[in-house]
């Protein structure tokens, strides 16, 4: 039986970019675009890129505020006030024991940013960080989508579902009137895209560091690798240490629009196990398709520390 599958075309180039800090040296970011052909039906879609940083450098944490120095106007209060209900930027630690952990920015001054839910255990420490704009639903909007019909579902930490509909080049909320294109898609989060078949072009930067993807006990977690340039083998996910042994698990789906389960996996704390609780061998070819996700159930809140696609 021939099944129509998610098709992905990728273009990658290396560009020298300057993060928004005069004291930060020029670095080479890997930027590019993916052309994603999503079939009719539903797919778990993961944007494979992040956005270029506005700041890269060191920051010292005091309470919930990170001390940074950015050019005037780079990040001002309007960045937050014009986006009700959703943050526009986040600060992420890029090295050390907390590499990959990110926190939404809720306010800022010219010399600091205040973030939400920063753990008190790291107060007073200095970190290497980046500040990036969030990827949003507008970044996956496509003119090939059907207005008021094609939609995405996002699963919230409490297990509830938020639905957004495509309209007029952007997205609207469940009331079919409130603008919602600024709805955030967090790194590693999958959205459930239901459509009649669309082509989506995403652009951005390949992430070169780890990503701490939140896992919630109260929800089915739709998550997936940030890998815009190729499928990711299940044994490359490095997810086993994040799962409770023999109880937490995840399901892999087809990408033909039917979301039929084709693989179930568990953990022994070290290795990923198949549905029969046998460790996957190093030769296992089970893979997560580029720009797609899987459904994970966790018995307790935690994080999956996802490796950079460049480390595979």
Regions inferred by a protein language model and the residue ranges of each:
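Autoprocessing Asn-cyclization modules and mimics
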Residues: 26-133
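Charged, amphipathic alpha-helical scaffolding segments
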Residues: 163-206, 271-312
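Short, surface-exposed loop motifs enriched in S/T, G, D/E and P with embedded aromatic residues
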Residues: 56-63, 103-108, 162-169, 263-269
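Catalytic cores of histone-lysine modification enzymes
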Residues: 24-58, 65, 128-159, 197-257
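Contiguous ligand/interfacial binding patches
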Residues: 161, 165, 241-285, 311
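Hydrophobic residues embedded in beta-strands of well-ordered beta-sheets
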Residues: 66-68, 111-113, 161, 170-172, ...
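Sec-dependent, cleavable N-terminal signal peptides
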Residues: 1-24
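Short, structured motif recognition centered on aromatic/hydrophobic residues
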Residues: 87, 91, 148-155, 187-192, ...
